[in-house]
């Protein structure tokens, strides 16, 4: 299965009638493996900062998580494994696997829990596959 198929079929799928706003699978080095059409253009340092937060949990808390033009307030996650951010009625979930970051962005009516479920399920699968 191609990386794009993982994004299209597993991340952008319908969940209780709702979809993520956008999603991507990005290598630890910031290289885009696959992304949905609406995934924001981001700066290399934004991915570097996300990776640093996985290595040093709490690194992003004072400044926020930036992804393209949007700043998310970092909320409870799982140190070294999951970063969650919130902005208004939407947010972002980032799951780290052995080689990639699985990222989902959502807005109402999708809930944070639905986004977490989709992103973490694929992330856990990729970890099981050695990815």
Curated annotation (Swiss-Prot):
GO terms for molecular function: actin monomer binding; proline-rich region binding. Keywords: Actin-binding, Allergen, Cytoplasm, Cytoskeleton. Disulfide bonds: none annotated. GO terms for cellular component: cell cortex; cytoskeleton. The keyword Cytoplasm applies. SUPFAM superfamilies: Profilin (actin-binding protein). The keyword Cytoplasm applies. CDD domains: PROF. GO terms for biological process: nuclear migration; regulation of actin cytoskeleton organization. It holds the Pfam family Profilin. Belongs to the profilin family. PANTHER family: PROFILIN, PROFILIN-A. Occurs in many kinds of cells as a complex with monomeric actin in a 1:1 ratio. Binds to actin and affects the structure of the cytoskeleton. At high concentrations, profilin prevents the polymerization of actin, whereas it enhances it at low concentrations. By binding to PIP2, it inhibits the formation of IP3 and DG. This is Profilin. It comes from Cynodon dactylon.
